[in-house]
């Protein structure tokens, strides 16, 4: 009897502590967490962006989720600017997570690394990308060549139903492949497609709140099947990627000429390794393991997100046929059909730019942004004190569907980004590439690919639904948010 009373008392105390957990710790309000698991099962992975938007309506632009550690969600535009941008250094950390340690066995890469040499690695990558002309004229030529091949492939379909995804995998994947390895792959080679399949297997459960339970309770990995954590599938795909990159590195090392200017990221990194080894100065992480994981990061980031945006673009296009007519007229009037579109044409294509910005707004790829953590104590985060190491989600996606900024936010309307004179308005409230110190390294490249591939396909084809009705705008949400598979038809203009 006494034991039962003690159990009941413990449960009552725990529920009381959970009920007032945020207030007791001086954290922003939020839904009441459950003992041990927090709010994990209140934010299902396939609806996490929608649930966060509902919590925003209830608790405001900053609130706390326990996943299972207390995690501060910032989802108001002005709050994001004040904290993630203006105080970016304090919010630029990455927490140690079970999933990253499982995937790369240490603190490596560019996007999820958190150690003393992260800044040096990011600076080096930015410098090499600039010297290689990433996102500049040379890249434009590469995209133009790949786009011509894409047009030929679609031409060969002869008005048959097309699933754009495998075609886009080849051309988009080849752009980052050229910068990383120094060459492009042919249509009959499968390496890029194999990587694409594997990275999607890795990402399927990458940001799942259930996976974050493993940060607190690693032994839950043994309950993979009942919890649907997907660990065996994730590790198999990850191991295949690492093995393939190791083989590519070994092959690359046999042919590199250290006396020549680097023609790829791998060349540049290996050359830097050699220089630093000669000077006995490897403290900034210039190792083969770092090179492999950095290429892993850049390859995956420079591929699937761009493919998803382009798929969203054509999904919204066939669902809004009046937009296609206006884009065709604008292209014909300002570019014509005799030459390829170039980046300088943007200033003459305001409606096309507005259309793509509306795609970025409604077709956001990350349902929830990757975890950050505070590197220092933050004395005033919207009236709350955050200790160093506090987990933070900068949920800029919520701004995209905020009525305060975008009236009728669920409606696809490119005209919202045109002024009264029909001029395009670049709106920094639409932020598909993150913000602050952890913003996307390849934003310029991604925007270039989306613009040039989209405009080339619009310049050459009329796009039609495959059947009497347009495909529904349905999404599949895991670590990424993408349209469900759909087909369209293309006819030569």
From Swiss-Prot:
<dbReference type="InterPro" id="IPR050182">
    <property type="entry name" value="Cytochrome_P450_fam2"/>
</dbReference>
<protein>
    <recommendedName>
        <fullName>Probable cytochrome P450 CYP36A1</fullName>
        <ecNumber>1.14.-.-</ecNumber>
    </recommendedName>
</protein>
<dbReference type="GO" id="GO:0005506">
    <property type="term" value="F:iron ion binding"/>
</dbReference>
<dbReference type="GO" id="GO:0005737">
    <property type="term" value="C:cytoplasm"/>
</dbReference>
<dbReference type="InterPro" id="IPR002401">
    <property type="entry name" value="Cyt_P450_E_grp-I"/>
</dbReference>
<keyword id="KW-0408">Iron</keyword>
<feature type="binding site" description="axial binding residue">
    <location>
        <position position="440"/>
    </location>
    <ligand>
        <name>heme</name>
    </ligand>
</feature>
<feature type="transmembrane region" description="Helical">
    <location>
        <begin position="60"/>
        <end position="80"/>
    </location>
</feature>
<keyword id="KW-1133">Transmembrane helix</keyword>
<dbReference type="InterPro" id="IPR001128">
    <property type="entry name" value="Cyt_P450"/>
</dbReference>
<feature type="transmembrane region" description="Helical">
    <location>
        <begin position="1"/>
        <end position="21"/>
    </location>
</feature>
<dbReference type="GO" id="GO:0016020">
    <property type="term" value="C:membrane"/>
</dbReference>
<feature type="transmembrane region" description="Helical">
    <location>
        <begin position="290"/>
        <end position="310"/>
    </location>
</feature>
<dbReference type="Pfam" id="PF00067">
    <property type="entry name" value="p450"/>
</dbReference>
<comment type="function">
    <text>Cytochromes P450 are a group of heme-thiolate monooxygenases. They oxidize a variety of structurally unrelated compounds, including steroids, fatty acids, and xenobiotics.</text>
</comment>
<keyword id="KW-0349">Heme</keyword>
<comment type="similarity">
    <text>Belongs to the cytochrome P450 family.</text>
</comment>
<keyword id="KW-0812">Transmembrane</keyword>
<dbReference type="GO" id="GO:0006805">
    <property type="term" value="P:xenobiotic metabolic process"/>
</dbReference>
<dbReference type="GO" id="GO:0020037">
    <property type="term" value="F:heme binding"/>
</dbReference>
<keyword id="KW-0479">Metal-binding</keyword>
<dbReference type="GO" id="GO:0043231">
    <property type="term" value="C:intracellular membrane-bounded organelle"/>
</dbReference>
<dbReference type="InterPro" id="IPR017972">
    <property type="entry name" value="Cyt_P450_CS"/>
</dbReference>
<dbReference type="GO" id="GO:0016712">
    <property type="term" value="F:oxidoreductase activity, acting on paired donors, with incorporation or reduction of molecular oxygen, reduced flavin or flavoprotein as one donor, and incorporation of one atom of oxygen"/>
</dbReference>
<keyword id="KW-0472">Membrane</keyword>
<keyword id="KW-0503">Monooxygenase</keyword>
<dbReference type="InterPro" id="IPR036396">
    <property type="entry name" value="Cyt_P450_sf"/>
</dbReference>
<dbReference type="GO" id="GO:0006082">
    <property type="term" value="P:organic acid metabolic process"/>
</dbReference>
<keyword id="KW-0560">Oxidoreductase</keyword>
């Amino acid at each position: 009897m006494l034991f039962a009373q003690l159990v009941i008392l413990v449960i009552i105390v725990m529920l009381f502590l959970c009920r007032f957990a945020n207030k007791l710790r001086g954290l922003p309000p939020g839904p009441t967490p459950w003992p041990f698991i927090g709010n994990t099962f209140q934010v299902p992975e396939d609806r996490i962006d929608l649930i966060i938007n509902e919590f925003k309506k209830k608790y405001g632009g900053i609130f706390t989720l326990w996943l299972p550690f207390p995690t501060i969600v910032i989802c108001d535009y002005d709050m994001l600017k004040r904290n993630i941008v203006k105080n970016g250094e304090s919010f630029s950390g990455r927490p140690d997570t079970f999933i990253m340690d499982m995937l790369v066995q240490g603190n490596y890469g560019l996007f999820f690394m958190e150690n003393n040499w992260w800044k040096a690695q990011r600076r080096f990558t930015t410098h090499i990308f600039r010297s290689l002309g990433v996102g500049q004229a040379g890249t434009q030529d590469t995209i133009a060549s790949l786009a011509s091949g894409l047009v030929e492939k679609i031409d060969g379909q002869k008005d048959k139903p097309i699933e754009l995804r495998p075609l886009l995998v080849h051309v988009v994947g080849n752009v980052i492949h050229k910068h990383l390895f120094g060459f492009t792959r042919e249509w009959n080679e499968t390496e890029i497609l194999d990587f694409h399949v594997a990275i999607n297997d890795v990402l399927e459960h990458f940001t799942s709140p259930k996976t974050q339970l493993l940060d607190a309770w690693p032994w839950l990995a043994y309950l993979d099947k009942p919890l649907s954590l997907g660990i065996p599938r994730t590790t198999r795909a990850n191991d295949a990627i690492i093995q393939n990159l190791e083989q590519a590195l070994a092959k690359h090392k046999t042919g590199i000429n250290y006396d020549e200017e680097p023609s790829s990221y791998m060349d540049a990194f290996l050359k830097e390794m050699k220089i630093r080894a000669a000077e006995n100065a490897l403290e900034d992480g210039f190792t083969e393991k770092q090179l492999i994981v950095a290429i892993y990061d850049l390859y995956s980031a420079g591929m699937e997100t761009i493919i998803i945006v382009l798929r969203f673009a054509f999904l919204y296009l066939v669902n809004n046929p009046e937009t296609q007519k206006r884009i065709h007229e604008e292209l014909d009037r300002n570019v014509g059909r005799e030459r390829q579109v170039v980046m300088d044409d943007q200033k003459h294509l305001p409606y096309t730019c507005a259309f793509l910005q509306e795609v970025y707004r409604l077709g956001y790829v990350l349902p929830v942004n990757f975890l950050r953590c505070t590197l220092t104590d933050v004395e005033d985060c919207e009236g709350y004190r955050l200790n160093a190491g506090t987990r933070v989600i900068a949920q800029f996606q919520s701004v995209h569907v905020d009525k305060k900024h975008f009236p009728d936010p669920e409606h696809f309307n490119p005209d919202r980004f045109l002024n009264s004179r029909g001029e395009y308005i670049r709106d920094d409230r639409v932020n598909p590439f993150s913000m602050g110190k952890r913003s996307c390294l390849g934003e310029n490249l991604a925007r270039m690919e989306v613009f040039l591939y989209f405009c080339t396909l619009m310049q050459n084809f009329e796009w039609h639904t495959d059947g009497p009705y347009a495909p529904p705008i349905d999404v599949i949400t895991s670590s990424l948010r993408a349209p469900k598979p759909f087909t369209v038809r293309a006819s030569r203009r």
